[in-house]
Amino acid sequence: MESGEYANEILVSDAGSNEKLDAQSQPEEAELKKRKRVLFLCTGNSARSQMAEAVVNNDLWDQWIAVSAGTKPTGYVHPYALAALEEAGIFHQGESKSVEVFKGQNFDLIVTVCDQARETCPLWLGPEKRIHIGFEDPAAVQGTEEEKMAAFRNTLKLIRATIPPVLKEFEGE
């Protein structure tokens, strides 16, 4: 089954979330196929791009399919990113992956979320619209465990406040 298809009223999303939908709230299959695709790109694909992917797949699942990647992936999703998402009620089973995984795929929008990824965004990604929405790296914060976790919570809050309104601007295009 492909991501975004229904099986027994369970929505399978790219973020790995399963959301039980009642029959009245289920959009038509044709509507789901009209969803736009967005790629969130950062360097390590361990925090910011992962959180952006999860937020979009949770909050805008009926309009967008989000994926994320890194130009130099770390190979893991930061535990504080997963903890912040869980606290916010967002289920995410992402994995840190290279942008190379998406070679040959088409996206309606590519969003770089860190300055380094913006500078090194591969040209082979194609002529899709590209925008940059930079967020400070929460993994760079030094301090106590609570201070570090607070940085991830704050970044998630900023992502959730910033990304959905920007994507809504691109829905009609």
Residue ranges with predicted function:
Residues 67, 109-111, 129-133:
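Hydrophobic/aromatic beta-strand patches that form the interior of the parallel beta-sheet core
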Residues 8, 14, 18-101:
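Conserved active-site segments centered on acidic
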Residues 45, 85, 110-111, 159:
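Conserved small-residue
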Residues 50-52, 78, 104, 120-123, ...:
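Short glycine-/acidic-enriched loop or helix-start segments at secondary-structure transitions
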Residues 70, 114, 134-136:
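Residues at the C-termini of beta-strands that transition into short coil/loop
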Residues 4, 10, 14, 20-22, ...:
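Phosphate-binding/catalytic loops
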Residues 46, 115-118, 137:
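Short glycine-rich anion-binding loops that position phosphate/pyrophosphate groups of nucleotides
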